[in-house]
């Protein structure tokens, strides 16, 4: 069996083979393009496969390595070493019919805030979840980021598009740019990313209807939170009496205090 260092596609999916095989359990997919398409990014397409999500990667190995995207080495390491609660990482690898690395498998997360659920009884907006759910998510995300540090993985490229909102509030997706690292600053940087993640969750609510000047102030606040070791503790304290209240109310209160 050849490895990923054989060439895969160039910069499009035009020449990608349809048939794929799961590396661990040898499940065979005759035509991945026949599966429901549920997501896209600059580096791949995501398809629904039962309770799993399959990411078909774009580009050949040289470009993916150069741009620090997902590689066979990284995906294999994630599969072997991670068991996360809120960050969706690879759980298996996809090979094409020639045994060449072509993508990876994740748990599929139902994003109740996506267009798919608009107008349905179970649709949610990010701010409709409760402060208690935020606190629960914060605890489990903290465990996940600590696990990343213990395994030598640096979280990268977390942005608004990284968030999914299932019934238990929030999960992070798109770990393609996460890096294997031995940097002495790894733990500190991951904790900054953790605090940044929680601040962004509130920012997405606080920024609704804000002027450019107010958004600039909110951006400054997010940066402050990322560098404030006590931010998570302060946030937990803020939640206190409004445990069952929607996150949007907490965010609205914070925005009024910050922007007045």
Regions found by a protein language model. Name each.
Residues 48, 108, 164-165:
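Conserved hydrophobic "DFG−1" position in protein kinase catalytic cores
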Residues 52, 104, 171-174:
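Protein kinase-like catalytic core scaffold
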Residues 145-166:
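Catalytic-loop of the protein kinase fold
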Residues 85-137:
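Conserved structural core of kinase catalytic domains
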Residues 166-259:
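C-lobe/activation-segment region of protein kinase-like
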Residues 3-63, 68, 85-86:
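ATP-binding glycine-rich phosphate-binding loop
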Residues 15, 58-98, 128, 132:
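A conserved alpha-helical element in kinase catalytic cores
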Residues 131-149:
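Conserved alphaE helix
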């Amino acid at each position: 069996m050849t490895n990923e260092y054989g060439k895969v596609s160039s910069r499009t999916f035009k020449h990608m083979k349809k048939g794929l095989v799961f590396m661990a359990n040898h499940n065979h997919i005759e035509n991945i393009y026949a599966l429901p398409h549920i997501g896209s990014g600059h580096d791949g397409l995501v398809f629904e496969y039962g309770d799993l999500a399959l990411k078909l990667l774009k580009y050949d190995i040289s470009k993916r390595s150069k741009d620090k995207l997902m590689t066979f080495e990284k995906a294999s390491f994630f599969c072997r070493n991670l068991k996360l609660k809120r960050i969706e990482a690879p759980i298996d690898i996809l090979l094409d019919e020639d045994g060449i690395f072509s993508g990876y498998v994740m748990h599929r997360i139902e994003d109740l805030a996506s267009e798919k659920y608009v107008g349905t009884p179970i649709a949610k907006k990010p701010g409709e979840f409760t402060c208690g759910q935020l606190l629960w998510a914060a605890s489990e995300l903290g465990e996940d980021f600590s696990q990343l540090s213990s395994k030598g993985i640096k979280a990268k490229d977390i942005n608004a598009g990284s968030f999914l909102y299932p019934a238990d509030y929030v999960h992070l997706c798109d770990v393609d740019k996460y890096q294997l690292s031995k940097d002495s600053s790894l733990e500190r940087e991951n904790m900054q990313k953790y605090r940044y993640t929680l601040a962004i969750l509130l920012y997405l609510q606080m920024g609704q209807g804000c002027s450019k000047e107010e958004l600039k102030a909110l951006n400054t606040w997010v940066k402050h939170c990322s560098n404030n070791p006590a931010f998570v503790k302060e946030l937990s304290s803020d939640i206190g009496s409004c445990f069952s209240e929607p996150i949007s109310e907490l965010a609205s209160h914070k925005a009024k205090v910050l922007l007045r």
